[in-house]
Amino acid sequence: MVRYNRDKFVGEKYEVLVVTEADVELSSVICVSIGRGRHKQVIAEHRHLVEQGARLVEMRLDYIRRNVTLQRLLKDRPSPVVMTCRRQQDGGKWEGTEENRIILLRAAIVAGVDYIDLE
């Protein structure tokens, strides 16, 4: 598992923390993926999934049709969130440039997302 340490910014990059099995208590958590075209649909489904018992959700940023507003997606979130933005070559819907995809994911880190998933 890889986590970014938001508290330690080195140059233009965040320090990357690599967590091994020896560092954490092993347990299983199912992460439910949300791929919807509108922010309000993602937010509503996130709330619904948590009400049904989900403990972790993945928000697929590549499904959102308009400009992604990270603060809106992360505000008052009812559970930890994994954000990802899949390229088409990885089975996703991202049509922008690779540079813009990385900028979006870095912005998610700055906005306080719990986890980032990269292919």
Question: PLM ranges: what are they?
Answer:
Residues 2-44:
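N-terminal amphipathic alpha-helix/helix-capping segment at the start of soluble metabolic enzymes
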Residues 21-24, 46-51, 67-81, 106-111:
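Acidic (Asp/Glu)-rich catalytic clusters
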Residues 29, 54-58, 80-82:
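A common structural microfeature
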Residues 37-50, 96-107:
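Short, acidic/polar
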Residues 74, 81-119:
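Glycine/small-residue-rich loop that forms an oxyanion/phosphate-binding "nest" at active or ligand-binding sites
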